[in-house]
Amino acid sequence: MALTVVDASILIALLDSDDGLHAAATAALLAHAVDELTIPASAYSEALVRPARAGRLDEARAVVGALLMEVVPLSPPIAEAAATLRARHQALRLPDALVIATGTSLEAGSILTGDTRWRGLAASVEVVG
């Protein structure tokens, strides 16, 4: 079974049927349904902001639970890898670097994102949409 890391943009789109990436994010997660799905804690927190504002945090947690998605904590090696990525790619935001660093540190087969600016940052990045 492969490991797939999920960016906040994918979970945000999955949780919001009006999101422009909703269908593509849903299809991508279905295509990786046999994989072990993980999301960095930083991306998980980012994806939960809208549901928290709407009083739908329990719903969002249930979706993550139904996907058997593991929330991966930030570790010193991941933080250091993210800092190195951020230093090399000045336009890359730190939250994005944390997701990519998580994927590379865990040797993920895929890192799913809706952010086209991630193309070419890591071989495992798959831009959805």
Model-derived features with residue positions:
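Active-site neighborhoods of divalent-metal-dependent phosphate/nucleic-acid chemistry enzymes
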Residues: 71-114
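Acidic, PIN/NYN-like endoribonuclease modules and their adjacent C-terminal/linker elements
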Residues: 1-3, 46, 100-129
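Amphipathic alpha-helical segments within well-ordered protein domains
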Residues: 45-48, 83
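Short, well-structured N-terminal submotif of metal-dependent ribonuclease cores
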Residues: 1-38, 51-62, 116, 120, ...
